[in-house]
Structure formats: structure tokens, C-alpha cells
């Protein structure tokens, strides 16, 4: 599955070879929910925060509004290969938005903890950004897609879950969702997802966010959602980078986990089915199935195919 298929599926094709670009820093209001249940049931009571991102546009004074791709980084923050994808989209005439959920909260990484900035907070950020950018004079609000990697892949994937999405906004939607190696081991009881296309890309050997649950996830949702999966052979987490494969001893391996996501937005522990609705409860829940130590790095063949 190539990224160009993803973009051409929804958007008109533009090309601005070699032109200059302009950048805008866009700021908007968001909040700091920990769990999806915080968003669904208590969104008005969450700590408020200002979040920003960088919008990149062709400098040409075109009369047509532009399609936009919102990018969401993973637990290590924005990496070289993430920017390469944004640059590729820009070269093909798309506007891009680099969402800075981490920098807005003075965080550089959540590896080995996953509590400082959560999937739920970043999904809220993404929709608040979409609301803001939908009013931008050069953006076509009906042609805004989201792409994310790892933690950002979770944002891209679960921003399509309607109980969560509708609690945030019913006024705007993403035209498509592309998720690189997301946590498919979160199993939703409620299978109501957006009808916009969702595509998951993951490595066969991923021991951070394993591929097997993605097969189950897609099979479960395929009757009601427009969702597909591509698995790359002999590939680890971060297969789309050019970095060598290394062992990250702090990273959480979820290969033995399958967490249930209930109707209210609580992610439940294995066995005990208690909600992991706070940092302490999440840490306790991880004791039942999570191990330390994961492999991460690129695969040249998979990278080429994914582009």
C-alpha cells in the first residue's frame, strides 16, 4: 500500500514542483484528558491548555482551496522520517499541519511511561486543530486527512471511533485516517467507526504494537467500517524510517496484551477488567501483560512500498 494511494483516494491531485512555501504557527484551545472516558463523560472539566502546530502552504496565490494532511508523531516526538512524509505531501501540492501536542506541554518523549501526553489528549488536540483549520481561507475543510505514527497512529485510528469523536465535535470530520503501527490491542466493544477510509500499516515483527491484534481489529470492524490493513514482512516498529534496528530497553512491549475498550471510553485491564483511568491504574494494569524492551528500526523494502 503506497501513501500516494491514500492521498489520491480522497483528494484532488495537485502538483507544485519546486515552488516556495509559507509556514504559519496556528494556536488553538485544547485540554488534558487522561482517558477517553474523560473526553466522553467529563470533557468540560478537563484542564485547559493552548496547543500549537505548524501549517505549511504553497506560497502561490491559488484560487482553489487546498487539501490538508494533519500529521501526528509518536512517543519519541517528531522524527526525521515523519518530516519526510510531510515534505512528500507538500511537494505534491498538499497543505500539511505538524501537530505539536508534546511541545505544547513541554514534553519530549513518553516512552516507558505513556502518561504525560495520552492518546485521548492528542485526539482532542487533533479535532480542535481540525476545527480551527476548517475556517482557514486556503483549506478545503472537506478534504482534511490525518496520518500518525505509533502513539500518533493510535490518534489516527481512534479519532475514527464515533463515541469519542461525537463527544468532541459533530461539525467536522476527517476525510481519511492513515495509521502507522498503531495499538490494535485496544479492542472496542462499540464498533461504530467513521465511514471515512481507515488504513493500518504495520510490520510483521513489531513487538511494540504487534501485528496480530490488527488482523482481529480489522476483521471485527470490516462489516461496519471502511477499514483495511497492510502488513510488511520482516519489519519492525518504525519500518518506514532509515534508522538501523536497535533495542530500546525502556519501551513497552504489548505483545501479550489485549485491552477491552468499553462503551464509556475506559480501557480495561486484562483479567481484572478494571478501568485504567489514571496514571496509577494504568501502571497497575500494565503489570499483567506488559514487558520492557522493544525493537525499532527501518526496513528498506517496507519503507519503499509504504511510500
Language model feature labels by segment:
Residues 114-137, 158, 306:
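Alpha/beta-hydrolase active-site loop
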Residues 21-64:
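N-terminal cap/lid segment of alpha/beta-hydrolase-fold proteins
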Residues 196, 209-220, 244:
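Short alpha-helix in the alpha/beta-hydrolase fold that links the catalytic acid
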Residues 226-307:
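C-terminal catalytic histidine-bearing segment of alpha/beta-hydrolase fold enzymes
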Residues 59-66, 71-108, 185-187, 205-211:
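Short substrate-entry loop that stabilizes the transition state in hydrolases
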Residues 138-150:
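Alpha/beta-hydrolase fold nucleophile elbow
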Residues 39, 75-83, 87-91, 101-121, ...:
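Cap/lid segment of the alpha/beta-hydrolase catalytic domain
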Residues 194, 200-202, 206:
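Short beta-strand/loop motif that positions the catalytic acidic residue
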Amino acid at each position: 500500500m503506497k501513501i500516494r494511494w491514500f492521498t489520491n483516494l480522497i483528494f484532488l491531485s495537485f502538483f507544485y514542483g519546486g515552488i516556495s512555501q509559507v509556514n504559519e504557527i496556528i494556536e488553538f484551545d485544547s485540554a488534558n484528558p487522561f482517558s477517553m472516558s474523560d473526553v466522553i463523560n467529563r470533557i468540560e472539566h478537563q484542564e485547559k491548555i493552548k496547543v500549537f502546530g505548524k501549517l505549511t502552504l504553497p506560497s502561490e496565490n491559488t484560487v482553489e482551496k487546498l487539501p490538508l494532511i494533519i500529521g501526528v508523531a509518536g512517543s519519541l516526538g517528531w522524527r526525521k522520517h515523519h518530516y519526510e512524509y510531510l515534505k512528500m505531501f507538500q511537494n505534491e501540492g498538499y497543505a500539511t499541519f505538524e501537530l505539536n501536542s508534546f511541545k505544547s506541554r513541554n514534553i519530549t518523549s513518553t516512552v516507558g511511561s505513556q502518561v504525560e501526553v495520552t492518546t485521548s489528549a492528542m485526539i482532542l488536540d487533533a479535532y480542535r486543530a481540525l476545527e480551527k483549520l476548517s475556517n482557514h481561507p486556503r483549506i478545503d475543510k472537506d478534504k482534511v486527512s490525518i496520518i500518525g505514527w505509533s502513539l500518533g497512529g493510535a490518534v489516527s485510528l481512534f479519532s475514527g471511533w464515533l463515541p469519542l469523536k461525537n463527544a468532541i465535535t459533530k461539525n467536522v470530520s476527517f476525510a481519511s485516517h492513515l495509521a502507522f503501527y498503531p495499538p490494535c490491542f485496544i479492542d472496542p466493544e462499540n464498533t461504530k467507526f467513521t465511514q471515512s477510509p481507515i488504513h493500518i500499516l504495520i510490520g510483521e515483527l513489531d513487538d511494540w504494537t504487534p501485528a496480530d491484534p490488527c488482523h482481529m481489529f480489522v476483521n471485527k470492524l470490516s462489516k461496519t467500517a471502511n477499514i483495511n490493513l497492510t502488513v510488511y514482512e520482516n519489519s519492525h516498529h518504525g519500518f518506514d524510517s532509515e534508522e538501523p534496528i536497535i533495542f530500546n530497553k525502556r519501551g513497552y512491549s504489548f505483545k501479550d496484551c489485549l485491552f477491552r475498550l468499553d462503551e464509556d471510553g475506559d480501557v480495561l485491564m486484562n483479567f481484572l477488567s478494571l478501568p485504567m483511568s489514571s496514571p496509577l491504574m494504568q501502571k497497575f494494569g500494565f503489570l499483567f501483560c506488559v514487558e520492557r524492551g522493544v525493537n525499532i528500526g527501518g526496513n528498506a523494502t517496507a519503507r519503499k512500498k509504504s511510500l
